[in-house]
């Protein structure tokens, strides 16, 4: 599915501070997002999509265990996001330190 295919759909956005991740993605493609609904919870978004209130773009990680009756389609261009690890250096266990080295 391309962003232009979704441009006329009503979106349910995941709030992250003052901006979501979908709006900038559309903006970079020269498109606008139509949205009236937003929430802080991925599962609430999936429930709203299941109820026919709109569509959304969610991380593949959360969709792997999706138990809602919704269609899951890959997005063209494979957009990605950066995820960071934040930790207190004084409290890192040996196992956690090894994991961070691996990253």
Predicted regions and their residues:
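Short beta-strand-to-loop elements that line the ligand-binding cleft
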Residues: 13-15, 32-41
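A ligand-binding cleft/hinge motif common to bilobed small-molecule-binding domains
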Residues: 24, 28, 42-70
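Small-molecule pocket liners
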Residues: 1-3, 9-10, 80-85
